């Protein structure tokens, strides 16, 4: 689950990470009032969407008067902001953050992610803040410093100081940088975040260390123990299909293709999408019905896929381990009838009760295209989507 910048800064503030004073605004009038409350002479008007690259897209403006705050708030609120992370369709801006200006002397970068290989937390830091870390990694990889943190020990003072110096923090500001880094780590750990990023972490002219931005992503499987994080959820920023899928415990992600995919198991789902692409097709979604799929879940999965007008064919690829093929077949038949299926349907089943499942499909009277291998299924569904 993602949250907005101003919400991320609320979290950082709780963990003693210095952030600028700022007030969220949902209208132009609220933006003006926020600016007046903060006082000048400089304010930053920031679009609040769940995507990076807002500055380059015109979603961050520096205002030097209340009139400019009004002007920028009017132009940003309601705009469709397109960045490299939103895709060409962009995101509608419904919230702003009005923030006091900062005296930026140097911009730094710091982030935390889970390193699954080492089973530790990876801290990445760079002296090249304020830009995409991917660009830094490509052009100046030597400027990215990585530290693996033992979760049982946490981020130690000496480690934080060493990283701070490596990214160019002067000695006089190292204690402040240590506080910011350790606060970020503690916030990351205690909220079950999967990513926490400050870009940029700035040094001001008088040597202060301040988090000028905040990005958090949380492990959805851990949200049950963080109601305070769930309260930050903004459904307007999420795909309506993915919200609907979550109601039925379906793992669904919208994609840009025209072939709907219904698979049990995340690994098999990814392999299925890869195979579709290998045969020249484009998946319209990732959809994992899990190991406990019921007729209701399969029916809802079909409804979700068919709400996408771009879907021209559907591939059901099932491995019957925990899930029996006859149960899936029953669900597929019921779902196809319930939604009056109007696009070609390719089904491939392997595993428990495979023969029974195939017989049920064959006897259903539905125009189902059968396949024995994943390659055959992918080839057939790509052809069907192309109208061949």
From Swiss-Prot:
What does UniProt give as GO cellular component?
Answer: cytosol; succinate-CoA ligase complex
Quote the cofactor binding remark. Binds 1 Mg(2+) ion per subunit.
SUPFAM superfamilies with a match to the protein in the record: Glutathione synthetase ATP-binding domain-like (SSF56059), Succinyl-CoA synthetase domains (SSF52210)
In the record, what terms sit under GO molecular function? ATP binding; magnesium ion binding; succinate-CoA ligase (ADP-forming) activity; succinate-CoA ligase (GDP-forming) activity
NCBIfam families, alphabetized:
PRK00696.1, sucCoAbeta
Q: What quaternary arrangement does the UniProt entry report?
A: Heterotetramer of two alpha and two beta subunits.
The record's listing under PANTHER family reads: SUCCINATE--COA LIGASE [GDP-FORMING] SUBUNIT BETA, MITOCHONDRIAL (PTHR11815:SF10), SUCCINYL-COA SYNTHETASE BETA CHAIN (PTHR11815)
Q: What is the name listed in the Swiss-Prot or TrEMBL entry for this protein?
A: Succinate--CoA ligase [ADP-forming] subunit beta
Q: Which gene name belongs to this protein?
A: sucC
């Amino acid at each position: 689950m993602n949250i907005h910048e101003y919400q991320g800064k609320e979290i950082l503030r709780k963990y003693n990470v210095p952030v600028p004073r700022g007030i969220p605004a949902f209208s132009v009038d609220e933006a003006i009032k926020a600016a007046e409350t903060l006082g000048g002479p400089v304010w930053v008007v920031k679009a609040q969407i769940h995507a990076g690259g807002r500055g380059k897209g015109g979603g961050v403006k520096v205002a030097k008067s209340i009139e400019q705050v009004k002007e920028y708030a009017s132009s940003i609120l309601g705009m469709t902001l397109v960045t490299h992370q939103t895709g060409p369709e962009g995101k509608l801006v419904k919230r702003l953050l009005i923030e006091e200006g900062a005296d930026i002397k140097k911009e730094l970068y710091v982030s935390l992610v889970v390193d699954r290989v080492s089973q530790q937390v990876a801290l990445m830091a760079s002296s090249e803040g304020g830009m995409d870390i991917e660009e830094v990694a490509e052009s100046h990889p030597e400027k990215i410093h990585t530290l693996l943190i033992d979760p049982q020990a946490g981020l130690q003072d000496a480690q934080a100081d060493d990283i701070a110096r490596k990214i160019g923090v002067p000695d006089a500001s190292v204690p402040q940088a240590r506080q910011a880094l350790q606060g970020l780590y503690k916030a990351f750990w205690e909220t079950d975040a999967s990513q926490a990023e400050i870009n940029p972490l700035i040094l001001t002219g008088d040597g202060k260390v301040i988090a000028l931005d905040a990005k958090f992503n949380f492990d959805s499987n851990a949200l049950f123990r963080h109601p305070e994080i769930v309260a930050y959820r903004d459904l307007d920023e999420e795909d309506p299909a993915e919200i609907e899928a979550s109601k039925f415990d379906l793992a669904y992600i919208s994609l840009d293709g025209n072939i709907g995919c219904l698979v049990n198991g995340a690994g098999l789902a990814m392999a299925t999408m890869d195979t579709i692409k290998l045969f020249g097709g484009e998946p319209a979604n990732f959809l994992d019905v899990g190991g406990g799929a019921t007729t209701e879940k399969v029916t809802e999965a079909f409804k979700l896929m068919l709400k996408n007008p771009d879907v021209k064919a559907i591939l059901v690829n099932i491995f019957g381990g925990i899930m029996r093929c006859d149960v899936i077949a029953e669900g597929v038949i019921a779902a196809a009838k319930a939604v009056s299926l109007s696009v070609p349907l390719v089904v491939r089943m392997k595993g428990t009760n495979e023969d029974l499942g195939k017989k049920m499909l064959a006897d259903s009277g539905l125009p189902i295209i059968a396949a024995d291998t994943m390659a055959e299924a992918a080839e057939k569904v790509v052809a069907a989507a192309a109208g061949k």
